[in-house]
Amino acid sequence: MSKPIVAVVGRPNVGKSTLFNSLCGQQISIVKDTPGVTRDRIYAEVSWLNHNFTLIDTGGIEPDTGDIILSQMREQAEIAIETADVIIFMTDVKQGLVDSDSKVADMLRRSHKPVILVVNKVDSFEKMMPDVYEFYNLGIGEPFPISAVNKLGFGEVLDEVVSHFPEGSDTDKEDDRPKVAIIGKPNVGKSSIINKLVGKNRVIVSDIAGTTRDAIDTAIKYNGKEYVFIDTAGLRRKSKIKEDLERFSIIRTVAAVERADIAILVIDATEGVTEQDAKIAGIAHERGKGIIIAVNKWDDIEKNDKTIYEFTNKIKDTLAFMSYAEIIFVSAKTGQRLNKIYELVDHIVDAQTMRIPTGVLNEILTEAVAMKQPPSDKGKRLKIYYMTQVSVKPPTFVMFVNDVALTHFSYTRYIENRIRESFGFRGTSIRFINRERKEKE
């Protein structure tokens, strides 16, 4: 089951970013071996009482005029309603209850999503509670007083948040259909690809409402097998502000990727691969999803015998951190190569669920270490005692070593490459965990 998504909504300057940063602490993982991926602090992974969830800060630009503020808050609320399992609605006790709070509260109430009302900047719970009680007038339940700066009141808020997380159901576990998120920048043809896949195959297509979110999934049957496609295209209300569009695009991507097994990153062939493509790709890569890069609008490109080769190299340079990704050149307009997507999805699902026997794995490890010695530091060399696979989706391996401090991502990448040479794992990331073990054990 995917991790729940918690979105933070509120007026400018009520302390959303302070709350976000305080809850995340040092848990935002910077992937050091991921060049080209700039990590926005729009989303982060948070853990509370054995509950893991993705926290999203919906706030983007903070304009000055009241009308624009209300308009932007509505967009924040809309994206939260659309993508989140639980919404934290943040207000400011010092500014008091204002009209835009009431209007956004009305939107949130109609969404039927769990809304946690948080009143920030309560520096003294004893003295300021009468001011906090004013927020009962919003009609969305009990206001929780906090001080984001002083980290007061977080426990009660987080307890309330996790109490609303959906329970895993039997149907979740039994649904073994591949779930494929179509991700990418706005206007690269994501919806067009799904529409063409639906139209081409002339089969019964059901729109399945997400169990906890408003996203619509499309189930398509091809060669007797069902696939679920998750579309991240377009907000219901289009923002006119470029930075908001980009932020909302990322939030929608996080929400879709959390629920998917495989992500198809759609790139516009006429624009080439961009930094924004790399940023979006990084979301799927960090979450260990299978990845297909679909270069759309290929029919609009003037080609010679080197065009595919040159474009592929450009993708591999810009997205070097996910060299394992499958690449396909397609046209949503003509349907060119779209049916090959199913073949790639099946292939990646097999790779994601592949298990390597420990004995075979350690033969590969022994050969790799013999060919290239592990790194050393201050006269002490890294020793890798053995390796075992502990999980799938993505394939995850534990390496038992003498000193975790001696491990280096470049040597781990070398081991990964040896494993890929032996077993493939095309289209899926591989994860490694280093564990220390004393030599006598």
Swiss-Prot record:
CDD domains recorded: EngA1, EngA2
Keyword Heme: no
Residues annotated as binding GTP 1: 10-17, 57-61, 120-123
Domain EngA-type G: 4-169, 178-353
Source species, domain of life: Bacteria
Family annotation (PROSITE patterns): G_ENGA (PS51712)
Key words of the record: GTP-binding, Nucleotide-binding, Repeat, Ribosome biogenesis
GO process annotations (BP): ribosome biogenesis
Disulphide-bridged cysteine pairs: none
Domain KH-like: 354-438
Binding site for GTP 2: 184-191, 231-235, 296-299
GO function terms (MF aspect): ATP hydrolysis activity; GTP binding; ribosome binding
Family affiliation: Belongs to the TRAFAC class TrmE-Era-EngA-EngB-Septin-like GTPase superfamily. EngA (Der) GTPase family.
Function: GTPase that plays an essential role in the late steps of ribosome biogenesis.
Complex formation: Associates with the 50S ribosomal subunit.
Protein name: GTPase Der
Natural source organism: Lachnospira eligens (strain ATCC 27750 / DSM 3376 / VPI C15-48 / C15-B4) (Eubacterium eligens)
